[in-house]
Amino acid sequence: MVALITNLLEQKGKNAPIVIGGCALSYYSREVYFTADIDLAYADREALDAVLKDIGFKKQGKYWVNEGLKMAIEVPSSVLIGEDSPVEIVELAEDLQCKIIGIEDLIIDRLNACKYWKSEIDCEMAELLIRRYTREIDWLYLEKKAVITENNILSELLELKRKAEQ
């Protein structure tokens, strides 16, 4: 669905939305984690709203819902953490792709939830991602981001890195 939305936005000369949150976690965890909705980061809400309406979604509170598809989309953020935030481009078919938040920023998101909200599932998911992607992670970028978040999660990050390297 996100690839279709991306395609329609790009046809209008707009940028692609970025998959974040639980849907991104489901992708990187290879479906160890499941979510009921799709979270997107996108700045041009007007353009996105128009595309969602065109393909049968209706606004219900903070969600865009398509009853026929049994699908909900939320746009909780207009941007990623920063301009230098990496994204993963997933090619689904020729001229059909979607962008997903980079693994590093997803780990930051999960560690923040782990520390701030005391969310055990987010602690577990951060550890799973670090173990699974330890060789692919840009550790310099990740450690820099861990220090500048409001929760300063560097010590938690380094502990998970140490465990993953054992």
Which functions belong to the PLM regions below?
Residues M1-Q166:
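Compositionally biased terminal segments of proteins
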